[in-house]
């Protein structure tokens, strides 16, 4: 792929939302940042364009992922789209030192990716789509070709069961993305009873850095979800770095601090 200095969109599937946007790219760049937006699995106002304010990150490829939304699709179809997008990036661009960052349910999907085979398999059982044969090639390619140097969790949802205990009104968007209580309970490692989720993480190595950010001014998510993620990673002996600060409301996505946070630094 030739260098890209002005943003371009590329399709990784047939649906209008199955696209990535490349904001800048050069095969000589030392690192690559790939962003997964949030929006409660359903909000069309959240898109890959949330990456645009961080163009000042130096010597880096910057890519955002769009994916299909609920209620048109249910979990784990959003996650499958992310895998397809990652495969497209690796097949078409010379990228290394990949940082994958996600905001809100984008962070949820980064957590899910750590056990994507099990999470997707369990999710499809609930939507009566048990045939995984069509996904075998996708799984194999991602497993063999995608290695993340850094993952960044940004004001995320990590346990939907606990989320609804704290915010019962959020059932409206959860119901759009899932078909039952068991479906969303099985959707992340923190609430699932599937013993296969004790397997080692996928797509990362012992050298992968885990960064967690939480704005103390977030008006939609308290620190509880972040504490739950911290407890989970600690139980797996996975090291991480936690950063908290007064960095704006949830939909401001760190506001004037976005570029600093998205680059993995501290405002």
From Swiss-Prot:
It catalyses: N-formyl-L-kynurenine + H2O = L-kynurenine + formate + H(+). InterPro entries: AB_hydrolase_fold (IPR029058), BD-FAE-like_dom (IPR049492), GDXG_lipolytic_enzyme (IPR050300), KFase_ver/fungi-typ (IPR027519). Pathway: Amino-acid degradation; L-tryptophan degradation via kynurenine pathway; L-kynurenine from L-tryptophan: step 2/2. Pfam families: BD-FAE (PF20434). GO terms for biological process: 'de novo' NAD biosynthetic process from L-tryptophan; L-tryptophan catabolic process to kynurenine. A motif (HGGXW) lies at residues 37-41. GO terms for molecular function: arylformamidase activity. It is an enzyme of class 3 (hydrolase). The active site is at 104 (nucleophile), 218, 250. Keywords: Hydrolase, Tryptophan catabolism. The keyword Hydrolase applies. It comes from the Eukaryota. Its EC number is 3.5.1.9. The keyword Lyase does not apply. Belongs to the kynurenine formamidase family. Catalyzes the hydrolysis of N-formyl-L-kynurenine to L-kynurenine, the second step in the kynurenine pathway of tryptophan degradation. Kynurenine may be further oxidized to nicotinic acid, NAD(H) and NADP(H). Required for elimination of toxic metabolites. The main chain amide nitrogen atoms of the second glycine and its adjacent residue in the HGGXW motif define the oxyanion hole, and stabilize the oxyanion that forms during the nucleophilic attack by the catalytic serine during substrate cleavage. Homodimer. HAMAP family: KFase. This is Kynurenine formamidase.
């Amino acid at each position: 792929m030739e260098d890209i200095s002005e943003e371009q969109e590329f399709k990784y599937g047939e649906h209008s939302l199955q696209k990535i946007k490349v904001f800048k790219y050069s095969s000589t760049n030392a690192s690559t940042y790939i962003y997964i937006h949030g929006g409660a699995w359903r909000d069309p106002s959240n898109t890959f364009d949330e990456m645009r304010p961080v163009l000042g990150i130096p010597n880096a490829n910057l890519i955002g992922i769009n994916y299909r939304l609920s209620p048109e699709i249910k979990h784990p179809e959003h996650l499958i789209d992310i895998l397809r997008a990652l495969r497209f990036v690796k097949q078409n661009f010379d990228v290394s030192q990949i940082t994958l960052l996600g905001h809100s349910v984008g962070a949820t999907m980064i957590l899910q990716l750590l056990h994507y085979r099990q999470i997707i398999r369990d999710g499809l059982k609930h939507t009566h789509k048990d045939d995984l044969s069509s996904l075998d090639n996708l799984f194999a390619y991602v497993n063999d070709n995608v290695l993340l140097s850094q993952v960044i969790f940004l004001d995320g949802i990590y346990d939907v069961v606990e989320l609804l205990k704290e915010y019962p009104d959020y059932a409206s968007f959860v119901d759009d993305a899932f078909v039952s209580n068991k479906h969303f309970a099985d959707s992340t490692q923190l609430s699932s009873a599937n013993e296969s989720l004790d397997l080692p993480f996928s797509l990362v190595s012992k050298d992968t850095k885990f960064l967690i950010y939480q704005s103390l001014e977030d008006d939609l998510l308290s620190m509880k979800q972040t504490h739950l993620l911290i407890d989970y990673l600690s139980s797996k002996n996975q090291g991480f770095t936690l950063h908290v600060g007064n960095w704006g409301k949830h939909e401001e996505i760190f506001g004037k601090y976005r570029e600093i946070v998205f680059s993995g630094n501290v405002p």
